[in-house]
Structures are given as structure tokens and as C-alpha cells.
Design a protein with these regions (language model features):
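Aromatic-residue detector
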Residues: 1-18, 31, 97, 101-112, ...
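Well-ordered alpha-helical segments within folded domains of soluble proteins
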Residues: 145-150, 201-207, 255-261
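Accessory "access/gating" subregions that flank catalytic or transport cores
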Residues: 56-193
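Membrane-targeting and insertion segments and their boundary/processing signals
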Residues: 37-40, 44, 118-122, 176-179, ...
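Hydrophobic alpha-helical bundle architecture
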Residues: 162, 173, 179-251, 264
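Mobile "lid/hinge" segments at catalytic clefts and subdomain interfaces of large enzymes
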Residues: 1-54, 216-219, 224-228, 232, ...
């Protein structure tokens, strides 16, 4: 299904009644063929499809808002301590981990593998906020909400040459991949396990990162495939049904896999 507003429901217009998108694709192969035939990136194809439904100003404001909500969620999660609700007595760990990372940075003592800790702490911050009832962006779900923002924040904060001007490219690319997965398979953990949630999120993040690192459409698709492939078989078995254990840490590992997939 799709989320619709009250106004959309009242209008009585269904998705099937809308004019077709200018660039129609149902598979990654079809998307890559469009990119090759038109000499465009995945983000450009996705953007032109979106512009058939809304103005450039509305689209750009929407993309900006999505990242603002994602980034604000990271920042809140990095600042809040305490115990998560639900009865498992899970401690919020993003805040102390972030404080330790900042202290190491100030002393110029960081080990090379510390970059993995940065990726993890960004993702954990989001999923601790989710577990506490905070506002997140479903990318593609609440339980996997930390992977895409953590990967984008990692790129912005830690990769030389990264610029906020390319955030829309990252998000549009990730959205194209997420749409393909939802159309052809599932993004529901209850239906297909965590491979459908964190696996899909990792694929989306890998694609977005590969795109802003200069990857071709084929490389972007391959990055998404690698990230998804290495989540296959992952089940959805949260302790006591709460989206905490193993979900919070799993998002951190999903981010690390996304970055590795983009590099490969």
C-alpha cells in the first residue's frame, strides 16, 4: 500500500487514474536501459518522474525537509541518554559513544577503524529515537530508519569533497532503488524478514552513496545489489516484539555494509 493524505483520499483520484510517468520502469534492467538510452543518471530519471506530479519548488522543498528531519533525528539521538521504554531496560548508547568519539577526535587519537563507529553511532541515534517514539523518516521503514540518514551523514561529515548540494541526488537515487524493491518484492519485515527492511535500506543507502561518489548507473545498481545480497536470509525476530534488540545495532551494521558495497 501507499500512504496518502486526507486531501488525496477526498479527491477520489487513484494512482491508476494519474497520467503515466515520463520514464516508466519496473526492474533495474529497465531503469539502466533508460539511463543508457537518454544519457541520464538514476537521480535525473527519478527527478523527471517526480516533476510530472509536482513542481520543482515543491519537490526541492520536500527533499530538503526529508533530510532536515533525518538529520535532526540523528542530532537528537546523539544528545539523549537514559533507558528506552518497553521493559527491556535497554540503555541508549549513541550519546556516550558519540562523546567518546568526539573526545578521541580532539586528541587526534582515532584508530582507522573508528570510522565504523561513526557510521554506527549515527544509525543507532536514529533507531534509539524511533524506539523512544521520536520522529523519524521511514526509509523505507521505521525499523530500518537509521541506515539511509547515517550513510548520508557519514558522507557529509567524513568524505572530502562532500557538499550538501548533492543531497537531492543521494535521496532520489535511494528512492528509485527502494521503489524497485517495494514493487518487485517487499520492504516489510513481518512479511519477508529483516532482509526486507535493513537489507532494503542498506541497498538504498549504497546506491545513494555510490551516486554522489561519481558512480555510473550500472555501478549504482551493482552497489545496491551487493548491499542487499549480504542481508539475504536475515530474519525479523525482535526481542519481546520491540524494535530495539537487535534492530538498533543492526542499522549500524547496515550502514557499514552500504558504504562497503558502494566502494566495491
Amino acid at each position: 500500500g501507499f500512504v496518502v493524505t486526507a486531501e488525496e483520499l477526498a479527491s477520489g483520484v487513484s494512482i491508476g487514474d494519474m497520467a503515466p510517468y515520463p520514464h516508466q520502469f519496473n526492474t533495474a534492467n529497465e531503469l539502466l536501459a533508460l539511463c543508457a538510452a537518454q544519457g541520464k543518471s538514476i537521480a535525473e530519471i527519478k527527478r523527471e518522474n517526480e516533476l510530472s506530479r509536482r513542481s520543482a519548488a515543491v519537490l526541492d522543498r520536500g527533499l530538503t525537509k526529508i533530510w532536515d528531519v533525518m538529520n535532526d533525528c540523528i542530532n537528537r539521538g546523539l544528545e539523549r541518554g537514559g533507558i528506552l521504554p518497553g521493559g527491556l531496560n535497554v540503555k541508549r548508547r549513541a550519546k556516550p559513544i558519540h562523546e567518546a568519539l568526539m573526545a578521541e577526535r580532539g586528541l587526534n587519537m582515532s584508530a582507522p577503524h573508528t570510522i565504523n563507529d561513526w557510521m554506527s553511532v549515527y544509525a543507532m541515534a536514529v533507531n534509539e529515537e524511533n524506539a523512544a517514539g521520536g520522529q523519524v523518516v521511514t526509509a523505507p521503514t521505521n525499523g530500518a530508519a537509521g541506515v539511509v540518514p547515517a550513510t548520508l551523514r557519514y558522507w557529509l561529515d567524513h568524505v572530502p569533497g562532500a557538499t550538501p548540494k548533492r543531497i537531492p541526488e543521494f535521496l532520489l537515487t535511494a528512492a528509485a532503488i527502494g521503489g524497485l524493491i517495494k514493487f518487485n518484492a517487499s520492504i516489510s519485515g513481518a512479511e519477508c524478514g529483516c532482509q526486507a527492511e535493513v537489507g532494503s535500506a542498506s541497498a538504498m543507502a549504497a546506491a545513494g552513496l555510490c551516486a554522489v561518489l561519481g558512480g555510473s548507473p550500472a555501478q549504482v545498481e551493482n552497489a545496491a545489489e551487493i548491499a542487499l545480497e549480504h542481508h539475504l536470509g536475515m530474519t525479523c525476530d525482535p526481542v519481546k516484539g520491540l524494535v530495539q534488540v537487535p534492530c538498533i545495532e543492526r542499522n549500524g551494521l547496515g550502514c557499514i555494509k552500504a558504504v562497503s558495497a558502494a566502494s566495491l
